[in-house]
């Protein structure tokens, strides 16, 4: 318990978006940041347990701040933060894929969204060894190194087949268009071709003879 408290206090001493917001609230209210953080975590947990739209709130927590931090990482000259957030998005995508198949069962558990939110916060925690880095090093990276050759071959084969199929469809469409265009014949339009012919035709009409 003391180790967890020390980690929380160390996190609150760092400079990031969360601590900046807590610092501004501390300056206005006079309440210490650790109490504000504890109150915010308690309110968030209660809302995830009993509030409406817990799934949407969880997804926003797992997406909004990481997206903001990723944009800052792209714009910064350092590449270390790029690696950190790329690792997070890999783990986030795999977690979303696993959740797609298990959400119908897990969403019935009362503490599911609280656990999901805690997991996402652990994965994005601004510390040298957060949940995303831990899962990547222990699970994702070994699987990738073991199977990336076969995956690359499958992807290359699928991309080649897709290009061949697209080329065949394009060729067939062009052939159909060419055949339909060749089958159209011009239709002659009836009517006088010149004004002179239009003037001569009434005079050629036979007149009745006088008896």
Swiss-Prot record:
Family indicated by similarity: Belongs to the DP1 family.
Chain intervals for the UniProt region annotation (Disordered): 190-211
Disease involvement: Retinitis pigmentosa 77: A form of retinitis pigmentosa, a retinal dystrophy belonging to the group of pigmentary retinopathies. Retinitis pigmentosa is characterized by retinal pigment deposits visible on fundus examination and primary loss of rod photoreceptor cells followed by secondary loss of cone photoreceptors. Patients typically have night vision blindness and loss of midperipheral visual field. As their condition progresses, they lose their far peripheral visual field and eventually central vision as well. RP77 inheritance is autosomal recessive.
InterPro entries reported for this sequence: TB2_DP1_HVA22
A Pfam family recorded for this sequence: TB2_DP1_HVA22
Subunit organization: Interacts with STX3. Interacts with clathrin.
Function: Required for correct function and survival of retinal photoreceptors. Required for retinal development. In rod photoreceptors, facilitates stability and/or trafficking of guanylate cyclases and is required to maintain endoplasmic reticulum and mitochondrial homeostasis. May play a role in clathrin-coated intracellular vesicle trafficking of proteins from the endoplasmic reticulum to the retinal rod plasma membrane.
One Gene Ontology cellular component: nucleus
Membrane topology, from the record: Multi-pass membrane protein
Disulfides per UniProt: none
Entry comment describing in which tissues the protein is expressed: Expressed in circumvallate papillae and testis. Expressed in the retina. Isoform 1 is predominantly present in mature optic cups. Isoform 1 expression is confined to the cell body and inner segment of developing rod photoreceptor cells.
Alphabetic keyword roster: Cytoplasmic vesicle, Disease variant, Endoplasmic reticulum, Membrane, Retinitis pigmentosa, Transmembrane, Transmembrane helix
Protein name: Receptor expression-enhancing protein 6
Species the sequence originates in: Homo sapiens
Compositionally biased tracts (Polar residues): 202-211
Segments passing through the bilayer: 44-64, 89-109
Chief localisation class: endoplasmic reticulum
Zinc in keyword set: no
Cellular localization per UniProt: Endoplasmic reticulum membrane; Cytoplasmic vesicle, Clathrin-coated vesicle membrane
Any single biological process term in GO: detection of light stimulus involved in visual perception
């Amino acid at each position: 318990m003391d180790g967890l408290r020390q980690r929380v206090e160390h996190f609150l001493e760092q400079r990031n978006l969360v601590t900046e917001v807590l610092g501004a609230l501390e300056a206005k209210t006079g309440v210490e940041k650790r109490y504000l953080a504890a109150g915010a975590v308690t309110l968030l947990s209660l809302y995830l347990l009993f509030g409406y739209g817990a799934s949407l709130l969880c997804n926003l927590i797992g997406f909004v701040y990481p997206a903001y931090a990723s944009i800052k990482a792209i714009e910064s000259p350092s590449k270390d933060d790029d690696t950190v957030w790329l690792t997070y998005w890999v783990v986030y995508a795999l977690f979303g894929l696993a959740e797609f198949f298990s959400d119908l069962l897990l969403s019935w558990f009362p503490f599911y969204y609280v656990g999901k939110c805690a997991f996402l916060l652990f994965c994005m925690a601004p510390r040298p060894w957060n949940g995303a880095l831990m899962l990547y090093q222990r699970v994702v990276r070994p699987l990738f190194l073991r199977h990336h050759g076969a995956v690359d071959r499958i992807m290359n084969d699928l991309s080649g087949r897709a290009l061949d199929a697209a080329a065949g469809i394009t060729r067939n469409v062009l052939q159909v268009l060419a055949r339909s265009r060749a089958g159209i014949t011009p239709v002659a339009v009836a009517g006088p071709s010149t004004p002179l012919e239009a003037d001569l035709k009434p005079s050629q009409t036979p007149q009745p003879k006088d008896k």
